[in-house]
Amino acid sequence: MFNWRRSQLSCLCASTLAVFVMLALNVQGRPANISALKGKQPNSKEDNEILPPDHLNGVKMEMDGHLNKDFHQEVFLGKEMEEFEEDSEPRRNRKKLIEIFTKVDINKDRSVSAKEMQRWIMEKTEEHFQEAVRENKLSFRAVDPDGDGLVTWDEYRVKFLASKGLNEKEVAEKIKNNEELKVDEETQEVLESLKDRWFQADNPPADQLLNEEEFLSFLHPEHSRGMLRYMVKEIVRDLDQDGDGKLTLAEFISLPMGTVENQQAQDIDDDWVRERKKEFEEVIDANHDTIVTMEELEEYMDPMNEHNALNEAKQMIAVADENQNHNLELEEILKYSEYFTGSKLMDYARNVHEEF
């Protein structure tokens, strides 16, 4: 289970392990993503919306293999997460957290059980799913200008390159005439990755066209079992250094390329190793055989897996369960508000029972 109160000794162990990994392996950098291209100034808001997001709300791992550091808040707060991010006033956030507690506490016994938390996690995950569906409708319209409900790879490619600053009409004409497109190496690499992903999202019988549902899977692989499997394969491919299609602990915690130049960078590396080691050993490696298979990683990544939701509920409760009764009381959830919401409530203990 996750331990919110980390010991100082774990830092030393993580440092030692990090050094071992760097010496023992030909360490590869963390997998690349399309963030750099997203950082380029888009021509409009729609331009960024046609790119698959690096971050998937309610999914434990990012598209590039990083752990989702906001996962707990996402599955606890759902669409309310933005409200906590935008409003840093402790008293208002405290009131909102109390309101959430009352909603999670279905039987109104003033405590939250693992089953109640599991149900809540599934509800919040579904909220993220529905938000992705709504956003996808707008994104699909942006790449389907003729409104026929189907998008070809070439149509998408035109919109994508236009979002990178190329003239849309010129690009469309060159593609129509099979002329060479001159783009920088980074853009070409992303195009090739997107093309592979595009055809993976094309459900059988393959027609090289994506409808709105398939386009949703293209942007959000968590909505399709097949695309989730594809995402897992991509992550394993980027981390798997010996090519056996599985992940060892050493491969999973491989550090970024580069020499640690200062203490701050060393601390970042220590956190990287410690967090990934814990997640690998205690959560992802379901049968605890020290190897993570694609099947195990796929189960771990599936946001609608009820067994995962129950385990997550138990882990979240364990973080704040100071009286060890396997339930969460209001006082506990307020005290550990930073874990659940990302916001620290300095006055959590004041008048708890009165406001409740």
Swiss-Prot record:
EF-hand domain location: 92-127, 131-166, 232-262, 272-307, 308-343
Glycosylation sites per record: N33
InterPro entries: CAB45_EFh, EF-hand-dom_pair, EF_Hand_1_Ca_BS, EF_hand_dom
Binding site for Ca(2+) 4: D321, N323, N325, N327, E332
Positions annotated to bind Ca(2+) 3: D240, D242, D244, K246, E251
Recorded GO CC terms: endoplasmic reticulum; Golgi lumen
Residue positions binding Ca(2+) 1: D105, N107, D109, S111, E116
GO MF annotations, alphabetized: calcium ion binding
A Pfam family annotated for this UniProt entry: EF-hand_5
Sites where the protein binds Ca(2+) 2: D144, D146, D148, E155
Protein role: May regulate calcium-dependent activities in the endoplasmic reticulum lumen or post-ER compartment.
Listed PANTHER family: 45 KDA CALCIUM-BINDING PROTEIN (PTHR10827:SF98), RETICULOCALBIN (PTHR10827)
Family: Belongs to the CREC family.
Protein name, per record: 45 kDa calcium-binding protein
Organism the protein comes from: Danio rerio
